């Protein structure tokens, strides 16, 4: 979904590799392992402070210069929560010589908090709740930004077991719907 002209498709390890391979196959753009992950760094978006999230992202990934230099890159990630990771990876790829970085997200935009165990409890901390898609694209310094549609996400899995609250604000229990409306 959301094609663009590019030389290479890269997925953010490890959560976005399968989505990147799928995008590559559908678009005909070659897939490369253009990012290398330090396996000893935990998920960065769940760190307790912004400073710790930024430090974790800096230590977590490295770009493979020989695969991105002078190329237009499609970067596939599973989601954008606060934008910290996306901004750092776009900068990392451009510092490694990428001409352009087009970000494609394998989920709809996250615009609502999660009250079911994921560390994103307020709208204010969510990049796409505070900004339009165009503003979010500028904030992460990407050349373009697109999200998977809700419809496409629903087609890809078992609808009855998929919580969509963080994408559309429809919580499966009224307790959390009321909490959001306060």
Regions inferred by a protein language model and the residue ranges of each:
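PRPP-associated nucleotide enzymes
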Residues: 1-182
